Swiss-Prot record:
This is Large ribosomal subunit protein bL19. It comes from the Bacteria. Belongs to the bacterial ribosomal protein bL19 family. One of its GO terms (cellular component) is cytosolic large ribosomal subunit. It comes from Xanthobacter autotrophicus (strain ATCC BAA-1158 / Py2). PROSITE patterns: RIBOSOMAL_L19 (PS01015). The keyword Thylakoid does not apply.
């Protein structure tokens, strides 16, 4: 690794320990909590949508989130390590076979849906995308 890559890796590690960045990829539905400053007041605004692309690398890495707001498609590009991002949460994992989902821009309704990915655990059981409910006990 050259000097610049080493410095970028150190900075990325330092920024990642302040705020946890979950492992997500295109097709995943995510909620990005963004700090919005209006005059002297500051608040956190949630932006929920489908991640349609991740680009760049290191400190310059960014991702694009697309959502439908009042019937109109809205896309927003966020740098992964931006200080204005309060938190990122993965709502559901999507099953896609592309790295860039720009084709979703031309689709509406059911054709724009993304199937949920089902991950398999080490013992072969199917675990739905990310979160798993606790197993029911005999007392319930």
């Amino acid at each position: 690794m050259n000097i610049i890559q080493t410095l970028e890796a150190e900075q990325a590690a330092k920024l990642a320990e302040k705020r946890a960045i979950p492992d997500f990829q295109p097709g995943d539905t995510i909620i990005v909590n963004v700090k919005v400053v209006e005059g002297e007041r500051s608040r956190v605004q949630a932006y929920e949508g489908v991640c349609i692309a991740r680009s760049g690398g290191g400190l310059n890495e960014s991702f694009t989130v697309r959502k439908i707001s009042y019937g109109e498609g809205v896309e927003r590009v966020f740098p992964v390590y931006a200080p204005l991002i309060d938190s990122i949460k993965v709502v559901r994992r999507g099953k896609v076979r592309r790295a860039k989902l720009y084709y979703l821009r031309d689709r509406r309704g059911k054709s724009a849906r993304i199937a949920e990915r089902q991950d398999r655990t080490a013992d072969g059981k199917i675990k739905k995308g990310g979160k798993s409910a606790p197993a029911p006990t005999a007392a319930e």
